[in-house]
């Protein structure tokens, strides 16, 4: 199912299911789920998912492919994911530019070293994943608090991966804001140095201000003004693309989340008027 560029969406979380099912038509343009959490789910939860995707387009954001991992990609899981995407007519599938497994699952999204070897390694695995999934995917810039090893900057690493893997970017604006603060670089310079043709979609979310120079990516609060402003800058640089509000816990009433979705739409309209 195709998404329009000015689509504004909300993350599908089980804690929000009753409210999402009762939501008025048109309140959101799409929902996003982690297929890892829904593959093989039946019963009431599975029925609820089917009811939602019958009327609202679905995108998917994976959690456990471990694109940067050292063990072989899980071919059986990738095939399960491929079938899930086909069944639910998913237009956009993304994964994290990270690793989350070694001898077992690590239950976290860990940063890769910013090295040429890591670029070659993760790019080859992205190409393999795309071939097995029979589709182009987007990778997301993750938030991180310490880099294992650096031969290059974060932006150089991201660009090298996008080029060698020939994949798209899901630009997480909150992660960019958090990383720029925590690691002392200019978020606007990061945007300028990204190739415009690679950005497929955006995420926005809330974070926690631990200290003036330390932000924690939580997805548990409202989007902060600086992140909204950075989203506007991204729209000016790359154009409006499907944009999702992520909220993973500490859920307010759905009406409050829909007000944030409406803020996405307002930023999109503002950018449209700028070109009108």
UniProtKB/Swiss-Prot annotation:
It comes from the Bacteria. Pfam families: MbnB_TglH_ChrH (PF05114). InterPro entries: MbnB/TglH/ChrH (IPR007801), Xyl_isomerase-like_sf (IPR036237). HAMAP family: UPF0276 (MF_00697). Belongs to the UPF0276 family. This is UPF0276 protein PA4106. It comes from Pseudomonas aeruginosa (strain ATCC 15692 / DSM 22644 / CIP 104116 / JCM 14847 / LMG 12228 / 1C / PRS 101 / PAO1).
């Amino acid at each position: 199912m195709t998404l329009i560029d000015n689509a504004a969406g909300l993350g599908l979380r089980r804690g929000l299911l009753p409210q999402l099912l009762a939501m008025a038509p048109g309140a959101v343009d799409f929902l996003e789920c982690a297929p890892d959490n829904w593959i093989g789910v039946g019963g009431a939860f599975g029925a609820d998912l089917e009811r939602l995707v019958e009327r609202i387009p679905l995108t998917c954001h994976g959690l456990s492919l471990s694109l940067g991992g050292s063990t072989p990609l899980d071919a059986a899981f990738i095939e399960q994911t491929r079938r899930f995407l086909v069944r639910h007519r998913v237009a956009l599938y993304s994964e994290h530019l990270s690793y989350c497994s070694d001898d077992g699952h690590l239950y976290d999204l860990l940063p890769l070293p910013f090295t040429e070897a890591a670029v070659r390694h993760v790019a080859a695995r992205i190409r393999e994943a795309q071939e097995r999934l029979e589709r182009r995917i987007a990778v997301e810039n993750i938030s991180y608090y310490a880099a294992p090893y650096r031969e290059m900057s974060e932006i150089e690493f991201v660009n090298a991966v996008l080029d060698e893997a020939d994949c798209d970017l899901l630009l997480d604006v909150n992660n960019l804001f958090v990383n720029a603060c925590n690691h002392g670089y200019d978020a606007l310079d990061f945007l300028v140095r990204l190739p415009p043709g690679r950005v497929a979609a955006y995420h926005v979310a809330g974070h926690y201000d631990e200290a003036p120079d330390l932000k924690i990516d939580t997805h548990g609060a409202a989007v902060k003004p600086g992140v909204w402003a950075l989203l506007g800058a991204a729209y000016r640089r790359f154009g409006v693309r499907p944009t999702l509000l992520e909220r993973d816990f500490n859920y307010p009433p759905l009406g409050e989340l829909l007000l944030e979705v409406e803020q996405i739409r307002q930023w999109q309209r503002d950018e449209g008027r700028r070109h009108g």
